[in-house]
């Protein structure tokens, strides 16, 4: 009887920790401001770090951009607990004008599954960027 009781107590102590173990994504920087960019620029780039502060491997399952003037690439490798990955973002201001706020959606195996980072820029005619 005591043996069964001990087994039940151990299960109650161990199993909840296993069930709660998960990857947790942390984004140290959620917005990147490119500032003033000339509309004849080829592209401007930035990086967003995705840190795994959980205790299970983190997978970036997909990265989606909100418009054709933006692209993003990322590593498809699992991110170990304590490590981080980088999402590389490019903004193409060619033939654009004005203020831009673009959203990049990052899907991971975390809760919540969908997160986002943003880029900002003020696109001006060539020679007016100063």
Sequence positions of predicted segments:
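Beta-sheet-dominated interaction scaffolds and their linkers
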Residues: 21-53, 126-130
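Short, hydrophobic beta-strand segments
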Residues: 87-95
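Short, acidic/polar linear motifs in exposed loop/turn regions
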Residues: 53-56, 95, 110
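Sec-dependent N-terminal signal peptides
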Residues: 4-15
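Surface-exposed binding patches on compact interaction domains or structured appendages
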Residues: 55-86
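Sec/Tat signal peptide C-region and signal peptidase I cleavage site
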Residues: 15-21
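Buried hydrophobic-core signal for structured, non-transmembrane domains
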Residues: 46-52, 89, 102-107
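Terminal connector regions
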Residues: 97-127
